Amino acid sequence: MSDQFSGVKDVSEHLKFDLTHLNTYLEENLASIGRVLDYKQFKGGQSNPTYLLEAEKGKFVLRRKPPGSLLKSAHAVDREYKVLTSLMDTDVPTPKTFLLCEDDKVIGTQFYIMEFSEGVIYWDPLASEAEKDKRKKIFDEMNKGIALLHLQDINKIGLNDFGKEGNYIERQISRWTRQYIDSETEKIDSMHRLIEWLPKKIPEQKYTSIVHGDYRLDNIVFDGSNNSIAILDWELSTIGDPLADFAYHCLLWHIGDISVSAASEIGIFSEKEYLENYLRRTNFKLENDWNFYIIFSLFKVAGICQGILGRVRDGTASSDFAIQMGKRAKMFADLGWEKAKKIL
């Protein structure tokens, strides 16, 4: 799996851009990095094409909207740039940002440039690339990162206007329902059942924070000592319910059906231990809503996968892996509905 996603490759033909145009723009707006001499495409990153820039003053990362017809509100690189820039002076590990370009004429779509965070990305959700006795450290760093994010004061860091406060789950159900319907390639019965069931079961939102929206192991860069140094892929970030964000992050234990004994054998925390560590770090209280949050998260990831499949249909997906990922929509929706039926 790591070979499929790790590192860079020659840029796909439909994702190439004019380097001369970029350099002309950078000369006026970001001369400090020098001229860009070459660029490659990162293998990972199915949604927003991401490039490694080889510039005169070092390596940098350019992340852009994909070309073509796009779903409304999708591929929001401007939002990524805003949240990353706001978090730069906090203890949340993020790459430094340099520039946002909203002029489509430069390389064809909006883009931003940030520092290149050199380190290790574990592409397997269980960190199988690491030795067994290192995995709990990796997972604890991951746990610490999301807790730090959820503890940020949105007013203090200037993100109070980054999204609407309250009714986060309701708005998310509406968003992913629209994305699913707009992208539907075949009717998934369990998805339609969840669309009907979820709005009736929404718990009271007790906390409000910045949420990442897609926080998982392969969106984190680690250094050689397995300290988290950069959280990536902020496209879905907004103001919302941190418990929902954390539940989405915990889908690993449900999709993989990882029991306490299995977690011990793998060398990671059980879900209960991992959840308790997060609640200890944040001092949040969780009543009896965890099952709902997990079901909602399965619905959300099904909507994301269906959106990817819709982009394959429309010819705007940026990776061959997108086809495989998109076909998982039914699996996630079916699992969510099976769990929902147990608490009807």
What would you call each of these model-derived segments?
Residues 286, 303-344:
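Helical subdomain adjoining the active site within ATP-dependent kinase catalytic cores
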Residues 243-283, 296-314:
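Active-site activation/catalytic loop segments of kinase-like enzymes and analogous catalytic loops
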